[in-house]
């Protein structure tokens, strides 16, 4: 199984925006 992106991984920022940001939006509803 692929490991989750590390904080130093280039894709970590994209992962945060695509996952954490939508979660915040859903919580505000």
UniProtKB/Swiss-Prot annotation:
Cellular compartment(s): Secreted, Extracellular space, Extracellular matrix
Biological process according to GO: enamel mineralization
GO molecular function: structural constituent of tooth enamel
Record keywords, A-Z: Biomineralization, Extracellular matrix, Phosphoprotein, Secreted
One Gene Ontology cellular component: extracellular region
Miscellaneous note of the record: This protein sequence was found in 70 kDa-, 20 kDa- and 18 kDa-rabbit teeth enamel proteins. Rabbit teeth, in contrast to other species, do not contain amelogenins, but amelogenin-like proteins. Enamelins and amelogenin-like proteins share this tooth enamel protein fragment.
Protein name according to UniProt: Amelogenin-like protein
Source taxonomy: Eukaryota, Metazoa, Chordata, Craniata, Vertebrata
Gene designation per UniProt: AMEL
């Amino acid at each position: 199984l692929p490991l989750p992106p590390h904080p130093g991984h280039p894709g970590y920022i994209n992962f945060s925006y695509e996952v954490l940001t939508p979660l915040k939006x859903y919580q505000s509803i």
